[in-house]
Amino acid sequence: PALLRGAPRSPGAAVSLAPQPVVAITGATGFVGSHTLEAALAAGHAVRALTRRDQPPQAGVTWVRGDLADRAALGALVQGADVVIHIAGLTNTPDPAQFEAANVTGTAHVIAAMAAAGVRRLVFVSSLAARRPELSSYGASKARAEALVEASALDWTTVRPPAVYGPRDTDMLELFRAARWGLVPLPPGGATSIIHAADLAALLVVLAASTGALIARQTYEPDDGREGGWSHKELAQAIGRAVGRRRVLAPHLPRAVLAAAAAADRLARGDRAKLTPDRVGYMCHPNWVVRSDRRPPPALWGPRIAGEEGLMATAEWYRRERWL
């Protein structure tokens, strides 16, 4: 297929594939989590998934009703599991205190449930924002959650994704919609890495099924393989091409203007605002490119979806679902 670049990696001597595990997933009904659930099922795993709402029956999936604050539900989720992929968390809110409850306390509850059930293997989804916790409450909460994971007795691997895009994503959808009008306002100059949700999901499932020195107590920063990432203008133009625009106007806006826009978004959309003061804090940082020394080893995993093609396919999905 046009989107595939390279072939699936075969684990080397330092990584071995364990028997197909029972995988417990938090956040399985969200954007990244839903792709991860699909990847786990495609790999033949039995899945236990946490959900806040009733879900239709699905072959291979045991749904557990509850959330990260529900200790009984977390206990039921991890009971009998071989590995937990902890994805659930809060990425955006106008109330910074909510980051602490969801991302820090929620992670502590997952760790406690695993310890009580005797489950040792944890794949934890953090964020590249954790590299600079002083820039945002979100990044700070993810950094504190990472510290809890690292201080635990678990066999953990932490994954720090950059900007994640793909079908079912509602965050980058805003950029696609703006590009259709030919105008994509940008933060001050900088660069970012990106990764397709399907590639990220594939990595999480590989980590869940693997053992060995390459993954034990490691923190990885995966991306689409583009060296140096994407400048903000490059990404805006690529999204423009994906929606059929040969060129888009992509002005860099000063931080003060973005802060004013965040206030306006809060007035217009309330708690559903996408642009918040906290998000402005890390948007204005010039370097959200993954560190090359923290990319997952090629023997373990490599990206299969190149950015340009992935953005094109995502735009097509948005059109097909009438999101664009």
What are these regions (language model features)?
Residues 55, 65-105, 113, 128-132:
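NAD(P)H-binding glycine-rich loop region in Rossmannoid oxidoreductase-like domains
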